[in-house]
Amino acid sequence: YTQEDYDHPNQTVTFLDNHDVTRFGYTQRSQKVYNAALAVLLTSRGIPTIYYGTEQYVIPSDASDVAGRVYMPTECGFSTTTTAYQLIATLSTLRRSNDAIAYGTTTVRYSDDNVMVFERQFYDDVVVVAVNRQPDSASVIPAIQTNLPTGQYSDYLDGSLFGTATTVQNNLIPSFTISGGGVCVWQYQASEAPSTPQIGDVISTTGRPGNTVHIYGDGFSGNISVYFGTTAATVQSTTANK
């Protein structure tokens, strides 16, 4: 809905909370909704920022930003087994491996008062995320269009947020029921490296002659030439994705 509001949406820094605002755990006490919000943050466009303690469901004593700056060893402890911690780890891995999340376009495939299904796509890489923000009521989602290829897709989160598998045929996800607070993540990655470079992001977007520019994407192995307009740039180094 806000694509036209940003020149470079994939470079925006996104967050649920930080040191200048109220802790998300203070305003949202339902862990189902909390986890669903984390899933959306980590699969949406932009650069997600995770405030320390978010993975521990920190709830401060009041709504001030100061109260949110807890001293972890004595005020909340640290566990690597919380659902939030595991969710952040799992979806961070997906962000690194599937370029649809880092660079892809966003298409809202379905939305109502409680549920949103959105699709991220970068060339042949596709990720579909279905989220029910209502923690207590399941919703039935009608069949929806998708760019996922025909095939069976397990929930990338292995059901940790009550997600289920799906089977795609002819670019259609069949009707499904999503549990209260549920999140489904289905993903597809192209099996072969691209034959031509696929540019995902360019940083920085402004500069002057002599500045170093970083180009991210896929298919950059081998001899690569870079031009800005008709001016050839000196390529200092390349990897498959940078």
PLM features per residue range, with description:
Residues 1-47, 56, 63, 101-103, ...:
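Alpha-amylase-like alpha-glycosidases and glucanotransferases acting on alpha-linked glucans and related
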Residues 3, 68-113:
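Aromatic- and carboxylate-lined catalytic core of secreted/periplasmic carbohydrate-active enzymes
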Residues 19, 41, 53-55, 91, ...:
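Conserved, mostly hydrophobic/aromatic
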Residues 72-77, 84, 88-93, 143-171, ...:
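C-terminal accessory region downstream of the catalytic core in glycan-modifying enzymes
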Residues 109-147:
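Carbohydrate-binding surface patches
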Residues 136, 146-151, 218-224:
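Short proline/glycine-enriched turn/loop motifs at strand-loop junctions of beta-rich domains
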Residues 166-196:
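C-terminal beta-strand-rich structural cap/linker in extracellular carbohydrate-active enzymes
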